[in-house]
Amino acid sequence: MTPVNVALIRDTKWLTLEVCREFQRGTCSRADAECRFAHPPRVCHVENGRVVACFDSLKGRCTRENCKYLHPPPHLKSQLEVNGRNNLIQQKTAAAMFAQHMQLMLQNAQMSSLASFPMNPSLAANPAMAFNPYMTHPGMGLVPAELLPNGPVLISGNPPLALPGVPGPKPIRTDRLEVCREFQRGNCTRGESECRYAHPTDVSMIEVTDNSVTICMDYIKGRCSREKCKYFHPPPHLQAKLRAAHHQMNHSAANAMALPHGALQLIPKRSALDKANGATPVFNPSVFHCQQALANMQIPQQAFIPTVPMMHGATPSTVSTATPPASNVPYVPTTTGNQLKY
């Protein structure tokens, strides 16, 4: 299986801006640099009330004479830059999770290619397994220890699967705050330093689609130097809330990048079996240790059948009943009646 290169694909959703409807009707009283919606020229392609901003224009390198993409004004350009950074973080997280998923799939494919434990009665035709067809001989399958890695072995388990049809948790937004609806009606009894929603002083800060305001990140970091900032400056209690939400989002992203519990199981290192005659140490390379455990148990077995050259048609039963060689019989001096005595 060839490795898969996960490349970041450019997504144009974060470059999309909503077109000002009043501008389309010709009744917008705000200038291009003041309206929070896009005022595209006629050469730009508008689809379903939205227009795509020019990526090269954001980088300051667009050389087209009549560009079909929108060249946004500075206040919309800064908004698109924030959207681009958030989109880049999401793409990197998705790419890392995809690479992790592919690694687990490759490990599962390698594990499935291993031969399964033999449990076939027809294996009794093998002379080395004739004494018990359901138990692997302790000496079978042994390989030199130098050919295998010395570290522990990691095998893939069953990672937790998401249930279909169950909606996931709503993502936390750390760059936006919901505007207090009671404050918009003029009857909010809580002060600006007590309400958990935003009380913006400028109506142009409010996003109509979701009734929220964009947070000034420079103000939270204590370095906003704009005289009239178009972003919302939250009070101290909302700043603490935003920091807690940002910390929770980073913690969730770190947990998503980590391996899920049970995905990898650690098998302890298997010790090599030293040979008494000084030969190369060997051990059983099976994934599970049941064969080695059975081999170490004191199980009564039948007599050992030596491996000797057999003629065609010979069976293990004929070999077991063969007469042992004369060299193994102890010498005993005997006398017969026909022997002459001097």
Curated annotation (Swiss-Prot):
It is found in: Nucleus; Cytoplasm. Residues 316-326 have a biased composition (Low complexity). Residues 316-342 are annotated as: Disordered. Residues 333-342 have a biased composition (Polar residues). GO terms for biological process: mRNA processing; negative regulation of myoblast differentiation; regulation of RNA splicing; RNA splicing. GO terms for molecular function: zinc ion binding. GO terms for cellular component: cytosol; nucleoplasm. Mediates pre-mRNA alternative splicing regulation. Acts either as activator or repressor of splicing on specific pre-mRNA targets. Inhibits cardiac troponin-T (TNNT2) pre-mRNA exon inclusion but induces insulin receptor (IR) pre-mRNA exon inclusion in muscle. Antagonizes the alternative splicing activity pattern of CELF proteins. Could inhibit terminal muscle differentiation, acting at approximately the time of myogenin induction. Belongs to the muscleblind family. This is Muscleblind-like protein 3. It comes from Mus musculus (Mouse). The gene is Mbnl3.
